Amino acid sequence: MNQVLQSIVSTGSVVTEDGTLRTCDVGIAQDEGEFLQEIMRRHRPEVSVEVGCAYGISSLYICEALREVNAAKHIIMDPYQHSWSQGIGIANLKRAGYADIIEFHEDPSYQYLARLTEEHVKIDFAFIDGNHSFDYVLVDFFLIDKLLEPGGIVVLDDFSYPSIRNVCRYFLLNLSYKCVGPQSRKLPELAQWQRLASRVRQGTIGPLLKSPWRRMLMPAWRMIVWRGVWLVSTPMRRFLVSRNSVTDAELNLPNSANYVALQKLRDDDDVTRGF
């Protein structure tokens, strides 16, 4: 762990520009920082974006992992870095030796992210921890989606906030994203139907349906097939069921974690998606 980050974690304090100690009352926990580093090391993003900086704790975790990627760049935006955080976050990053890989902009995220889309910038990773209001988070994620390459990861902090949870649900239900952590797990019922589908593909159930019992079994078989489609096919559920009735567990969202990671599966067609 970088010495600057290690000092903050061990003392719970940050150092202001004039050398005084200040209680570190904002920032991510160590488990979330290690989760970020695990994601970064697994996917090795070359260009990443961070919304919000404050004291730079999340940025320190990210940059420590990014240092392992050649020619990596981390774009940070925080309109309150000097007015509220007294420049501590950027100072920490410079003291830690990451000045060469960060690009800081003291602009609102909705303005600078829009500028990046106009410049056709592409990114591989994003961390959203700015304004937690639903509209701000939604706009941040919407613009980041335009920048994010398929396979890229978006991590959102403070997932326990209803506003952030609802934004995640929207993107999982309406765009091509899946939840990849933490505590990702399959529904037991879904796993059962997937095992059944595997048996069908292997031909172990087919002969039974061709036997004299076929007439009795077919109605139940149709119910099994449709039940499997209902559980396995997200597009089918979108047509057949209200989105509000899809549970967090079905979307693989964690119950109690304070952060969540979504992976972009592919680019969505803006024209056809609107119909």
Show the residue positions of the predicted features.
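S-adenosylmethionine/decaboxylated-SAM
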Residues: 22-275
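Rossmann-like AdoMet
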Residues: 1-28
